[in-house]
Amino acid sequence: AYLTGEQMLERAGLRAGERVLVTGASGGVGSGIVQLARARGAIPYAIAGKGKEQAVLDIGAEKVITRGVADLPAAVNEATGGQPIDVVADLVGGAIFNDLLRILRPEGRYTTAGAIAGPVVQLDLRTMYLKQLQLHGSSQGTRADFRRIVRYIEEKKIKPLVGGVYKLSDFHRAQTDFMAKDFVGKLVVVPDAVADTAEG
């Protein structure tokens, strides 16, 4: 998750002092991006599900917008105090895609590595070329990204969030909980013997 997030920020060229809007910020990759943005000295704003706002603030989000808000551009503008968004790190896709492009400042950068709300979107090319936006797809990280992540962990700049640990024999329950999306971070499935050793 952190490797994917680091590559997204690297491809978008996120720099210290810039503002980044993170969708899906309570998930494994999204929560990683919030922390990775802070580690770079950037200012992360987040979109997360209802009831998860405080957890996302606790990992470093400047402000959290509740997913499903009626007017996303207005909510982001209010959250930033009218300051522009330099980068959108989108893990959701779907119906909010065009709003995310409208939220970006001229010459802003959009990066994606997910489409949980839907992979097919409509793009008004005028939005892209009149604002001179950069659109980046990202699916995997590099060794250099991995080395930065290890350094951030050693420096205690990031801390992976574990939303739950399940025995392999409880995989069905882990999948059910994953689909319910009632957690923040990642769910971990371990072999029964490892879980039994940890419990004992």
Q: Where is each model-derived feature located?
A:
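Short, glycine/polar-rich helix-capping loops at beta-to-alpha or helix-loop-helix junctions
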Residues: 48-57, 120-125, 147
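Local beta-strand N-terminus motif with an aromatic residue
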Residues: 17, 61, 84-85, 158, ...
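Glycine-rich cofactor phosphate-binding loops and adjacent beta1-alpha1 units
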Residues: 58, 62-132, 195-199
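Mid-domain Rossmann-like dinucleotide-binding core that forms the NAD(H)/NADP(H) cofactor-binding site
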Residues: 1-70
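Short conserved AdoMet
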Residues: 15, 105, 182
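Structural detector of well-ordered beta-strand residues that form the stable sheet scaffold
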Residues: 21, 45, 109-111, 136, ...
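C-terminal hydrophobic helical "lid"/dimerization subdomain
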Residues: 143-200
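Rossmann-fold dehydrogenase core element
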Residues: 106-113, 122-164
